[in-house]
Amino acid sequence: MDKLKEKGFVKLEIYLENKKRLHSIFLKEDTEDVEKKSLYLINVPITTTEKILKRAISQLGGRIVNIYPNISGLLKSGTHLRVKLVEPAEVKQVIKAASKKTTSLPWKFTQHTGLKRYVESYDRQFVNPRVLAESVDSYMKRVTKKEIAEKRRLFAMKNQPDEDGFVTVVRSGRAPVGRPQDAERQLEKKKDTGIHKDFYRFQLREKKKKALLDLAHKFEFDKQRIQQLKEKRQFKPY
């Protein structure tokens, strides 16, 4: 610590674990920064996050715009950081505030430590039920919208022969009562196109059968996937 003071570092005492323990961080201006907006921090607590660091420096009068290296996960003991502030004057202000013997900051952690930290990390591997429900609802809305568009397309094709003379058979709800002449014409058409309709009924049955098989396969796949996820949740911390 004396060597750090000799090199121009200022000691800042912070409270850890609800003011039960003091921890020392050492600060110094980065003289190699031509903009004179950077600070060196030595011995940063291992559970420090970007949010915690920004809040602490702001209490000393500085506004952090960049942290190097990026903070991600648990830090190593005695971690060194370089932070860049908005204005050069803020560097002077932070060092001045930290150098006062009466200055001590509460270092409020936003996450648990020890076993609780690993439990939280494990739980984050799984999708939040609310987020999952919203995702499913959104997906079902898209499917419903697509089905409606498909029904409209099929309805537009109803009784319209294609290039080969085939007519797409589309099942609909209640049909309006037609005139006797229309009924007679429909009977004549049925006599002429009975074979075609039987052929299309067969196609529709096969298509429906295939769709049901696909749904069954997807159901089995999803069931196996859910089982795998349940097995993975057998968390053993020791």
Curated annotation (Swiss-Prot):
Signal sequence interval, chain numbering: none
Record-level GO BP terms: ribosomal small subunit assembly; rRNA processing
GO annotations of cellular component type: CURI complex; cytosol; nucleolus; nucleus; UTP-C complex
Family statement: Belongs to the RRP7 family.
Alphabetized InterPro entries for the sequence: RRP7, RRP7_C
Organism this protein belongs to: Schizosaccharomyces pombe (strain 972 / ATCC 24843) (Fission yeast)
Subcellular location: Cytoplasm; Nucleus, Nucleolus
Primary role: Plays an important role in the synthesis of 18S rRNA but is not required for the 5.8S and 25S pathway. Is necessary for the cleavage at site A2.
Primary location group: cytoplasm
Keywords (A to Z) from UniProt: Cytoplasm, Nucleus, Ribosome biogenesis, rRNA processing
Name the record gives this protein: Ribosomal RNA-processing protein 7
Keyword check for Cell membrane: no
Gene: rrp7
TM annotation in the entry: none
One Pfam assignment: RRP7
